[in-house]
Regions:
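Face-selective signature of the C-terminal outer-membrane beta-barrel domain
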Residues: 264-292, 342-374
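Transmembrane beta-strands of outer-membrane beta-barrel proteins
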Residues: 103-105, 131-133, 175-177, 282-284, ...
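Transmembrane beta-barrel architecture of outer-membrane proteins
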Residues: 24, 44, 49, 87, ...
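Periplasmic plug
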Residues: 17-20, 26-76
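Residue-level signature of outer-membrane beta-barrel architecture
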Residues: 49-51, 74, 123, 165-168, ...
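Outer-membrane beta-barrel translocator/receptor signature
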Residues: 42-44, 56, 65-74, 79-161, ...
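Acidic/polar loop-and-plug regions of large Gram-negative outer-membrane beta-barrel proteins
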Residues: 138, 148-168, 172-267, 307-346
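Structural signature of outer-membrane beta-barrel domains
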Residues: 34, 110-112, 138-142, 182-188, ...
Length: 374
């Protein structure tokens, strides 16, 4: 059963999907991918719902529920889907109301107290008006132990709800309304666990596989230079992560703070279909969507055991004086404050977006070899 994008990648040859740095997800279709991160970076694969852009990052959070079909088009689709559809297009078509009262409910349970449930109600109020309500929920305890905090992380707590209403205004005109909302509030990891063999020049050696949970050597990164300039170290030749507890496990991590992950996404579409004649159809779509996203992750993947020595070299009496202060991370309205006495690296992503789409399409159904979409 295809329940989310990872399942879709298993059944569609050439499609690779993974979480990306920042607030997004990375996609590759037939070896073509776009992995840049930034406000000016646009993806090269378009993810639509009912023909309008839904947002690949938002859909990667909750997965699929109550769909009619999933369309995967490989290769450039710019003629109908815009300049960003260089890799291809994934179009999610939601199930519409039908003419009979019906409903369904299913629950799947697994280890780590995993529960996934789906509910659907189809409600034909009259011959001309029908509605369909669907709800999906996924909860799971954390599968990775953070030995530093003592908590389990990488859990799931997400739900999605969709309301679809169809109104047959006349025999030639139909109005379709769709409102979709999803929300996540959990401690899932943004990317995963580091594998590194420390190297004083490269940070992590490109010639060795390394160990799970081993942080990079700060001498091989700009961190050592910044620490020296800031007076936190007496030299740039100082590795803050020497002697750390590298667990070498996929089931355990040793990081300063547990991840945080929050998202609320709403998508509202109104579509008008009107048959002008037997040969011409007019389709007008309008969409409004919002996304409120935040996550925090510990990006040095371990806890530095060597405190900042300051400008005094190791062994100097003054170097024994603890160097610490209260540092605040994440910006106003987000993040946290904590006592800082050693190296640490946190990644934050905050996204507040609002999108409007409007489209009018004229579709022909002419007798003969030529038809058009305008």
């Amino acid at each position: 059963m295809v329940e989310d994008f990872s399942d879709l990648a298993e059944v569609v040859p050439g499609l690779i999907i993974d979480k990306a740095i920042g607030s997004g997800a990375s996609y590759s279709m037939r070896g073509v991918g776009s992995y840049g991160v930034g406000a000016a970076v646009v993806g090269s694969l378009v993810v639509n719902m009912n023909g309008h852009e839904y947002g690949s990052s938002a859909l990667a959070e909750i997965g699929f529920h109550d769909l009619e079909r999933i369309e995967v088009l490989k290769g450039p689709q710019g003629t109908l889907s815009g300049r960003n559809a260089v890799q291809g297009l994934v179009n999610i078509v939601s199930a519409r109301p039908t003419s009979e009262w019906s409903g369904s409910f299913d629950v799947a349970a697994g280890n780590y107290n995993s529960t996934r449930s789906n509910l659907m109600l189809n409600m034909p109020f009259s011959d001309r008006i029908g509605a369909r309500l669907s709800y999906s929920m996924f909860e799971r305890d954390g599968t990775i132990e953070n030995v530093y905090t003592g908590n389990d992380i990488d859990g799931r707590d997400a739900y999605g709800i969709r309301l679809s209403v169809d109104f047959d205004i006349s025999e030639t005109t139909k109005l379709e309304f769709t409102h979709d909302r999803s929300e996540t509030e959990d401690n899932r990891q943004n990317i995963g666990i580091i594998v590194c063999a420390p190297h004083p020049v490269f940070g992590c050696s490109p010639f060795e596989r390394g160990t799970f949970g081993q942080s990079a050597d700060t001498r091989g990164s700009t961190a050592s230079i910044f620490n020296f300039i800031a007076g936190l170290n007496s030299t740039a030749d100082y590795n803050s992560y020497e002697g750390i507890n590298a667990l070498g496990s996929l089931e355990k991590v040793n990081i300063n703070r547990d991840p945080e992950h929050h998202q609320v996404f709403e998508f509202t579409m109104l579509e008008l279909n009107h048959d002008i004649s037997d040969e011409l159809q007019l389709v007008v779509k309008g969409t409004y969507s919002t996304r409120d996203y935040y996550h925090m992750g510990d990006n040095d993947y371990n806890v530095a055991v060597s405190p900042f020595p300051g400008l005094f070299p190791p062994g100097h009496p003054a170097a024994a004086i603890p160097m610490q202060w209260t540092g605040c991370f994440g910006g106003e309205g987000y993040g946290f404050c904590e006592i800082v006495d050693s190296d640490r690296t946190y990644e934050f992503a905050v996204v507040e977006s609002e999108t409007r789409q409007l489209e009018a399409t004229l579709i022909s159904n002419l007798d003969g070899p030529i038809n058009f979409v305008a």
